[in-house]
Amino acid sequence: MRIAVLALQGAFIEHEQMLSRLGVEVFEVRQLADWLQPKDGLIIPGGESTTMTKLLYELGLFDPVKQAIEAGLPVFGTCAGLILLSTLGTMAVEVVRNAYGRQLGSFSVEAPFDFGSQSPASCPLPPAPCPLLMTFIRAPYIRRVLSEDVKVLAEVDGRIVAARQGNQLATAFHPELNDDTRVHEYFLDMCRNKMSSTTKG
């Protein structure tokens, strides 16, 4: 399995380190030539969403990334990555940027995360939401979902902070900043399922 990490700006190194810990091959996408490499999934890290969007356009990556996601490439967006999935128009969510303001610019909280049928062994059986430490840094949140295809995976204080729509996973928090690998494992399972279905097809 090879996972592409968008490395234009932001916290991409932490994602790479997390995936390496899980034994996954990773490569950085900094230009169109990088993007053309074979890949089984994409991670869009946190950072500055306006800057990332501008760079995607300037480097000729905006449309290829959008088309790949629309074609079924598994993608995981964190923080600014969540905003970018909304900007790309691939994920049917309405996002509020920098929702927590400066006073709560950075904080951690434990809240339930719904891993569903992909619940790790540490979660209760039958599958149920598992407590997960979530780290937020000037985070957005999802104000509302715009399609029945979007499944809410986690909420904090009534605000949606994680969701999935088919091949797209998005979190307002930064799982790569904690030692817990479960959210990344969840995403890798999405990639494996896609690889399996493609092979069978």
What are these regions (language model features)?
Residues 1-2, 129-132, 164-169:
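Beta-strand-turn-beta hairpins that frame and shape the catalytic cleft
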Residues 43-45, 136, 172:
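Structural motif
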Residues 87-159:
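Pocket-forming structural segment of enzyme catalytic cores
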